[in-house]
């Protein structure tokens, strides 16, 4: 096999690591200074995130970004570990929204609660983020939103996830890690890829929007300045 074949096999092995598996089987408690836990974990994350750019995954991103770009208003929902991912989506997408479109974080942990979705309907889009074990609230809210005509985009970890069956477009990411916890790094990367593609499809000058926003925040004294 050629180098690229071997590289592909190695990357796949890293991506498919089971959550909770020790950083390197066969390495004792003292570890191996030549093959550190930090290096193995970093390699795994790099392979998982890199796989998001493969053709099949890229097509999923493009389809989902098209739905986001055409949306009237955007909402994001995620519980527990998925909450920071949905919050990051709202923060990034708010730069693209402009004055004519709202981007709202909803859910039990969000200031808006679920009330913001009461009047959501056709033309609106909800990003629902959920990994196994799936939160009942996320599933129920996504299902009800779809019934109201809201387009649901899911970021989840399996093609048989309950969110996949509800969503109009789905981004599959892995949450496996080389340690004891589920990794959300690929989900964060997915949000940023979606934002970049949505900016392109919206034909929005995102850099100018960010500049304007930061200038406004600076005028309100949001940013720290060193003492003179």
Predicted segments with their positions:
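HTH-adjacent hinge/linker in prokaryotic transcriptional regulators
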Residues: 1-59
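Glycine-rich phosphate-binding loops that contact phosphosugars or nucleotide phosphates
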Residues: 70-202
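Internal, active-site/partner-interface "lid" segment
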Residues: 201-228
């Amino acid at each position: 096999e050629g180098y690229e074949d071997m590289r592909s096999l190695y990357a796949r092995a890293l991506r498919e690591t089971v959550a909770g598996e020790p950083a390197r089987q066969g390495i004792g408690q003292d570890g191996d200074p030549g093959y550190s836990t930090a290096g193995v974990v970093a390699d795994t994350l790099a392979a998982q995130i890199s796989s998001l750019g493969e053709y099949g995954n890229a097509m999923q991103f493009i389809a989902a970004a098209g739905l986001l770009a055409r949306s009237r208003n955007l909402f994001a929902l995620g519980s527990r570990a998925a909450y920071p991912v949905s919050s990051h989506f709202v923060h990034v997408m708010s730069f693209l929204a402009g004055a004519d479109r709202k981007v709202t974080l909803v859910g039990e942990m969000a200031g808006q609660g679920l009330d913001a979705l009461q009047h959501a309907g056709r033309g609106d889009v909800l990003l629902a983020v959920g990994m196994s074990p799936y939160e009942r609230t996320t599933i129920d809210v996504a299902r009800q939103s779809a019934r109201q005509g809201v387009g649901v985009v899911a970021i989840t970890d399996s093609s048989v996830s309950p969110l996949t069956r509800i969503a109009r477009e789905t981004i599959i990411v892995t949450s496996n890690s080389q340690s004891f916890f589920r990794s959300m790094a690929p989900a964060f990367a997915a949000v940023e890829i979606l934002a970049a593609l949505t900016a392109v499809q919206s034909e929005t000058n995102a850099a100018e929007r960010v500049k304007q926003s930061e200038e406004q925040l600076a005028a309100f004294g949001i940013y720290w300045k060193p003492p003179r």
